[in-house]
């Protein structure tokens, strides 16, 4: 199958459920853990339903406004979600402790980059050049924002994604051990990578 017939479009609030589902895939369950920690704010909802509510917002890093969807024949087959990482010294959390399971992800960032928070494709649409196309879109977004680099996190066990990112010029900057949890589908290390635009 080729990239032919695949279109890209800005996400809308109505896409929030699909965004949450794809984000769950790209994070290998990490966001399911995040959404589970918010369950007291959303009683009776499953993690992906909580994610959909959060992505329906127009504000914040985790908003549909930061996502581009890939479609084929009217069906969403993938997504790219990005947001800028704050400049160094711009402030941040007010000293609240970080959840130990999330600490590795919280500390791995590169200021002044466009962070790819989710690059996901459904199983039957991988290996078609769509990931490369999405990284190209992210590079365009970074240039539009005046940023000169991209950043992302990837699990060392995700060989397919690592191969794509290395081919696209990403290099390892740092890594941290994954804290095991039943909702997180990976072990080993999570790797912080950057690439020029």
Task: Say what each PLM segment does.
Residues 7-22, 27-34:
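A short beta-loop-alpha structural element at the N-terminal edge
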Residues 28-55, 65-66:
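Conserved GNAT-fold acetyl-CoA-binding loop/helix
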Residues 56-69, 85-90, 115:
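A short helix-loop-beta-strand connector motif used in the catalytic cores of GNAT acetyltransferases and
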Residues 75-78, 160:
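Glycine-rich acetyl-CoA-binding "A-motif" of GNAT/NAT acetyltransferases
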Residues 81-118:
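Conserved acyl-donor/pantetheine-binding loop and adjacent beta-alpha core of acyl/acetyltransferases
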Residues 113-114, 135, 142-153:
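Conserved GNAT acetyl-CoA-binding A-motif
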Residues 121, 127-144, 163-167:
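Conserved acetyl-CoA-binding loop-helix of GNAT-fold acetyltransferases
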Residues 148-151, 155-162, 167-168, 178-197:
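C-terminal "cap" of GNAT-fold acetyltransferases
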């Amino acid at each position: 199958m080729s990239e032919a017939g695949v279109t890209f479009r800005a996400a809308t609030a109505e896409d929030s459920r699909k965004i949450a589902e794809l984000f769950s895939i790209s994070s290998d369950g990490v966001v399911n853990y995040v959404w589970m920690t918010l369950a007291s704010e959303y009683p009776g909802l499953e993690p992906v339903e909580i994610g959909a509510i959060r992505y329906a917002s127009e504000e914040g890093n985790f908003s549909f406004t930061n996502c581009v969807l890939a479609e084929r024949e009217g069906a969403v087959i993938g997504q790219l979600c990005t947001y800028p990482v704050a400049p160094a010294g711009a402030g941040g959390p007010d000293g609240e402790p970080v959840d130990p399971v999330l600490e590795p992800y919280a500390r791995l960032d590169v200021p002044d980059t466009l962070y790819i928070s989710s690059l996901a494709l459904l199983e039957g649409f991988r290996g078609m050049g769509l990931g490369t196309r999405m990284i190209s879109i992210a590079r365009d977004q970074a240039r539009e924002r005046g940023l000169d680099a991209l950043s992302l996190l990837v699990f060392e066990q995700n060989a397919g994604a690592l191969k794509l990112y290395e081919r696209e010029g990403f290099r390892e900057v740092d890594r941290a051990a994954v804290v095991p949890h039943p909702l997180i589908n990976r072990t080993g290390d999570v790797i912080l990578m950057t690439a020029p635009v």
